[in-house]
């Protein structure tokens, strides 16, 4: 029998109950179903007085999931989707993402669309959209201390109650630049609608092969977001005496010391989204973030006295 998977947010009763119902439905349709919670993809935070908690990228793959799976289903919000791709992107499994959370910017459908969606899924009536991911590595001399896959962004910022930071940043083999700021964000196109957007970065459509660097509260009028090819690796050298905090996808990370460096590159593992209709990014921007909506109602759209 073909094998498929379900990853769900076990902190949400709705996701748990729907996961159980889906498991039974898929088993009745002739599938073997592997179940896993989204917590398996959580990175966790390293404490400053303890050794760095390092889990290799390939070691996040849950048991009983493998490359033979034609698809897996994710039940949760955006955090669960990010966690699921950290777990399954190395296996190349396409994911149908179902929103049981709040905004669900990365999810494909809502629960009320589930019956039709499962029918399409079983019949193979869908497209696959591939989105680039980023590999984040923390190096000390030549030693790998920590690594993670990122679908959204890497953030390197100062600790609370410390002063502004300086960063030496080298993109590809170009001359390095110095940025003075509270922190920096390096994001994928998918992450351009997340933290980077709040920091003043532009929205980048998912099909554009770029990375984006955005400073957080820079101390210069000349420091602005930069968009560059994702074929260019990025190396960040902390040029400040204080330790910093590295966070990936708002989920977890570790402390970065002045002698460390952060290396970013395009991941060989894409995130494969199952699309039940033709992807329309601008519709999602309008629906989820209110992009392009009029600020003032037009006379023809309101009832005039």
From Swiss-Prot:
A GO term, aspect molecular function: metal ion binding
Domain of life: Bacteria
Keywords: ATP-binding, Cytoplasm, Kinase, NAD, NADP, Nucleotide-binding, Transferase
UniProt-listed InterPro entries: ATP-NAD_kinase_N (IPR017438), ATP-NAD_kinase_PpnK-typ_C (IPR017437), NAD/diacylglycerol_kinase_sf (IPR016064), NADK (IPR002504)
EC class: transferase
Active site: 78 (proton acceptor)
Compartment list: Cytoplasm
Cofactor(s) listed: a divalent metal cation
Catalytic reaction equation(s): NAD(+) + ATP = ADP + NADP(+) + H(+)
Keyword Magnesium on entry: no
Major subcellular site: cytoplasm
Knocked-out gene: effects: Insertion mutant shows a slight decrease in NADK activity compared to the wild-type. Under photoheterotrophic conditions, mutation does not affect growth rate. Under photoautotrophic conditions, the growth curves of the wild-type parent and the mutant do not show any differences, but mutant shows large differences in NAD(P)(H) levels along with massive changes in metabolite profile. Mutant exhibits a fast-growth phenotype under light-activated heterotrophic growth conditions and light and dark cycle conditions in the presence of glucose.
Ligand binding (NAD(+)): 78-79, 152-153, 182, 193-198, 251
EC number annotated for this UniProt entry: 2.7.1.23
A cellular component term, taken from the record's GO annotations: cytoplasm
Induction remarks: Expression decreases after transfer to photoheterotrophic conditions.
Keyword Zinc-finger: no
A Gene Ontology BP annotation from the UniProt entry: NAD metabolic process
Family: Belongs to the NAD kinase family.
Misc. remarks from the entry: NADK activity derived from sll1415 makes probably a larger contribution to total cellular NADK activity than activity derived from slr0400. Slr0400 cannot functionally replace sll1415 under photoheterotrophic conditions.
NCBIfam families: PRK02649.1
Protein purpose: Involved in the regulation of the intracellular balance of NAD and NADP, and is a key enzyme in the biosynthesis of NADP. Catalyzes specifically the phosphorylation on 2'-hydroxyl of the adenosine moiety of NAD to yield NADP. Functions as a growth repressor under light-activated heterotrophic growth conditions and light and dark cycle conditions in the presence of glucose. NADP(H)/NAD(H) maintenance by slr0400 probably plays a significant role in modulating glycolysis and the TCA cycle to repress the growth rate and maintain the photosynthetic capacity.
HAMAP family: NAD_kinase
Name of the protein in its database record: NAD kinase 2
Organism the protein comes from: Synechocystis sp. (strain ATCC 27184 / PCC 6803 / Kazusa)
Gene coding for it: nadK2
């Amino acid at each position: 029998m073909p094998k498929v998977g379900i990853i769900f947010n076990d902190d949400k009763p709705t996701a748990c109950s729907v996961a159980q119902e889906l498991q039974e439905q898929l088993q009745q349709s002739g599938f073997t179903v592997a179940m896993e919670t989204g917590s398996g993809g959580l990175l966790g935070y390293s404490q400053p007085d303890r050794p760095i908690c390092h889990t290799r990228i390939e070691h996040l793959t849950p048991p009983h999931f493998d490359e033979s799976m034609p698809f897996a289903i994710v039940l949760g919000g955006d955090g669960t989707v990010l966690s699921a791709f950290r777990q399954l992107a190395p296996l190349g499994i396409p994911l149908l993402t179902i929103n049981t959370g709040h905004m669900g910017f990365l999810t494909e459908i809502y629960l009320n669309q589930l019956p039709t969606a499962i029918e399409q899924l079983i019949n193979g009536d869908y497209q696959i959209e591939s989105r680039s991911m980023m590999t984040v590595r923390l190096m000390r001399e030549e030693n790998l201390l920590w690594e993670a896959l990122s679908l959204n962004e890497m953030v390197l910022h100062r600790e609370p109650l410390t002063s502004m930071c300086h960063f030496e940043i080298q993109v590809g083999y170009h001359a390095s630049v110095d940025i003075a700021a509270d922190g920096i964000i390096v994001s994928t196109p998918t992450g351009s609608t997340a933290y980077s957007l709040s920091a003043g970065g532009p929205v980048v459509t998912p099909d554009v092969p770029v990375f984006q660097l955005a400073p957080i509260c820079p101390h210069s009028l000349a420091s602005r977001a930069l968009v560059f090819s994702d074929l260019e690796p990025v190396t960040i050298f902390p040029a400040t005496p204080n330790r910093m905090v590295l966070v990936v996808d708002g989920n977890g990370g570790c402390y970065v010391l002045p002698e460390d460096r952060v290396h970013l590159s395009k991941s060989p593992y894409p995130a494969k989204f199952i699309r039940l209709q033709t992807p329309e990014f601008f519709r999602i921007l309008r629906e989820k973030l209110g992009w392009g909506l009029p600020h003032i109602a037009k006379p023809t759209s309101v009832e005039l006295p």
